Amino acid sequence: MEKINLNEYLAANEYPGRGIAVAKASDGRQMFIGYFIMGRSENSRNRVFDPVPERGGICTMAADPAKLEDPSLIIYNPVLTLGKTHIVTNGDQTDTIFDEMSRGKSFADALRTRTFEPDEPNYTPRISAVVYADGSYQMSILKSADGNGESVQRYFFDYPQPVAGEGRFISTYKHNGNPIPSFEGEPLRFACPRTIGDFAHDLWKIGRAHV
């Protein structure tokens, strides 16, 4: 798979939804993990990230509690840390992975208990990643079979020996639409920025461009 320029890819995509990017720094000594959220409805757009230091993660919360209509599917922990393992997802499956791995189960075991989100007709995919202490990582997407709400398809991607200077990106959606088409194929391969600051800045810049 050819490497993409993640900035250009996201800038040209009107609505990728929620996205996860995992990369190995060019020096091979650090792993970068990024997560972003976008929303189309007022309820979806009414949220911000808040730290959860006691669990080594972050949660989403309403930017304006008075405007919160339905907390299901939009209020959750996108990031949690279990020992030296970092979990990032686009929904409450973060807690499922955390709980099941705490019991000795695997990333895949945990996600086999879950399915896509019940937001007909989009059936938003559940995207997840787990990054281990040795730098290896796994990603997953749980999605409907071309919009069939009675059929789940679970995909898992394993990166035991990531290459320095590159990463993988997955999002909930392929692009905007009605209904919104789910992401297709394996996570996209992209060139990693030089520093974590550049990595974070690039994702923030793209997110702000779509506001």
Across the structure, where does each feature detected by a protein language model lie?
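Conserved short alpha-helical segments that host acidic/polar catalytic motifs at enzyme active sites
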Residues: 1-210
